Amino acid sequence: MFKKFQIHLLDNFPHLKNQKILLALSGGLDSCVLLSLCLKQGLNISIAHCNFQLRGKDSEDDALWIKKLADKNKLECKLKRFNTEVYAKNKKISIQMAARKLRYDWFDELSVKHNYEAILVGHH
């Protein structure tokens, strides 16, 4: 899998090798595999994790696990807690749309503030 990723990366995104990258890490399989591949490739990444507070203690546990994973790999880790349900209600949008808006607005904010040149998200 790594060899295919490496070839795809070099063929389609050669500029990423020298860029400061923000990697969105949900804790799910897709984003964790992406993190592993990026670490193996030696990319300059920082982690961003959104806690949408939709799953109670499980949401908090995910954030703690991601912080430990970042520390273990000596990666900068940005964590943010959102009041997603209130935001969705106030904007009269679905929880999914609210989470998407909150997530990508925050990623844009981080990119400007910390000069990230690319944002990677793991979705199948």
Regions found by a protein language model. Give the residues of each.
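Core alpha/beta nucleotide-donor-binding catalytic domains of modification enzymes
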Residues: M1-H124
